[in-house]
Amino acid sequence: MQIEEHRTMTKTKAYIAIDLKSFYASVECKERNRDPLTTNLVVADQSRTEKTICLAVSPSLKNYGIPGRPRLFEVVQKIKEVNNTRRWKALNRTFTGSSDDSTELNANPALKVDYIVAPPRMEYYLEYSSKIYNIYLKYIAPEDIFPYSIDEVFIDATDYLNTYQMTARELAMTMIRDVLKTTGITATAGIGTNMYLCKIAMDIVAKHIKPDKDGVRIAELDEMSYRRKLWNHRPLTDFWRVGKGYAKKLEEHGLFSMGDVARCSVGKPNEFHNEELLYKMFGINAELLIDHAWGYEPCTMEQVKAYKPETNSVCSGQVLHCPYDFDKAKLVVKEMTDLMTLDLVDKRLVTDQIVLTVGYDIENLTDPDRYRKYKGSVTIDRYGRKVPKHAHGTTNLKRKTSSTMLITDAVMELYDRIVDKNLLIRRINITANKLVDESFSKEEETYEQLDLFTDYTVKEQEQAEEEAVLEREKRMQQTMLTIKKKFGKNAILKGMNLQEGATAKDRNEQIGGHKA
């Protein structure tokens, strides 16, 4: 009863989630003075072969059944199928030309479907994103905006509706129209009484409504309309934070929709479907799942902005362009470690724990000779293919440090220990855990058990010499950072960066693993 009274007395919140439509593709279209809604365009790096993942697909290409993040060869195959069908309908089964504009293609069936493959320009997309964020700032204070990604934001509009004498829908439309007028990029928006509902309104409901003439879609949800519209919605993976693993586990227990989860949460103790079942499956995360099943989300914008994690980490990962053998992949791991330690020095952070994960290539099992030799565990990857189980390990350092020398030695030892020398490698991830500010690290007291057999005079001298070496290394790292910031990341390269199979030189010219 008290909970219901509290909800009644609490001011109704209004949250807006805005997602820029096919952002990367839209930017590339506008830079070519083309309409993002009618131009067939994919953003992908063709130099990486047709297996490369497309970063974005324009809306007109999606109309042919192409998903949002396909491999480039999937786009090629789909358009080939579309053109085969169009050819049969064309006069004399012959194309008279080609076009990458959906308006022209719809008007003339004798045209072959064409499309533009635009190489990614991540730095340029970041500039566009910053420009659009500044448009939001014309209407909303920064403390009420949470950038969720490069093309998506959450906005707490509660205190602005009275100021502007607008509804949440009108305010959302005003901001989207301003973005469209300034940049030519349209958007989809969701409005909800909490952050979860506005996200779901945008991700699920808005995508099933008809857009206006500018391609804008806006949907609204509150707790009750969420239950009416989406309790029977499938698949579960359409919902925020429900991945394939969650969905599979729920379906194995007879729960196929959010309505099923909600009903399970109020089941009686003597029934199979009850709250305890959810906690057995997901532990404390079941609390969040149950809240979301009912359309509740207690976390506010203020809490999101104030959140500070208990522990911090820095992660670096890459998918190799082709399978690497043990030695070539070890070189890449060494490069990645080197760059990570420079990043730690730049941020004045130190670590005492490194985690390494190495994923193996599918060729290890498709090649008959390699398959016969492999006796280890086999898992299924995200594409449903059999691959050797990945290698995963952790190494703890004796001290908190950002030293390239100490961390690299530890990572190389870990790599040799956990990685199968006979397997081809495709993915590498390195994480530095338990990060703290280097100034705090120096203040930490350390203790040591003394014994009668150690010459502590010699030991202190060795420690002093090690500190001197680490101090020289630190100055060298800082000098390298200064030069790289002034003249570019490739202004200074090490010998290993020029060896066959090295990737650091190319990655220095990328942002997020894609061309800058």
What feature does the model see in each segment?
Residues 1-516:
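Basic, low-complexity intrinsically disordered segments
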